Amino acid sequence: SCCARNPACRHNHPCV
């Protein structure tokens, strides 16, 4: 799973 709309989470779960 990724965090498309959460900048704080994107570095952990980037959407590729």
Curated annotation (Swiss-Prot):
Post-translational modification: Two isomers (with different disulfide connectivity) have been synthesized (AusIA-globular (C1-C3, C2-C4) and AusIA-ribbon (C1-C4, C2-C3)). Only AusIA-globular contains the cysteine connectivity described as typical for native alpha-conotoxins. However, AusIA-ribbon is more potent than AusIA-globular, suggesting that another disulfide connectivity may exist in nature. Both isomers adopt very flexible structures without having a unique folded structure, lacking any stable alpha-helical and/or beta-turn units.
Site (Important for the structural rigidity of the globular toxin, which impacts ability to inhibit alpha-7/CHRNA7 nAChR): A4, R5
A GO CC term attached to the entry: extracellular region
Effect ascribed to mutating R10A: Loss of ability to inhibit alpha-7/CHRNA7 nAChR for both globular and ribbon toxins
Expressed in which tissues: Expressed by the venom duct.
UniProt effect for mutating A4S: 1.5-fold decrease in ability to inhibit alpha-7/CHRNA7 nAChR for globular toxin. 2.65-fold decrease in ability to inhibit alpha-7/CHRNA7 nAChR for ribbon toxin
Job description of the protein: Alpha-conotoxins act on postsynaptic membranes, they bind to the nicotinic acetylcholine receptors (nAChR) and thus inhibit them. This peptide has been experimentally synthesized as AusIA-globular and AusIA-ribbon. Both forms are active on chicken alpha-7/CHRNA7 nAChR with similar potency (micromolar range).
Free-text note on domains in this protein's UniProt record: The cysteine framework is I (CC-C-C). Alpha5/5 pattern.
Protein name: Alpha-conotoxin AusIA
Species of origin: Conus australis (Austral cone)
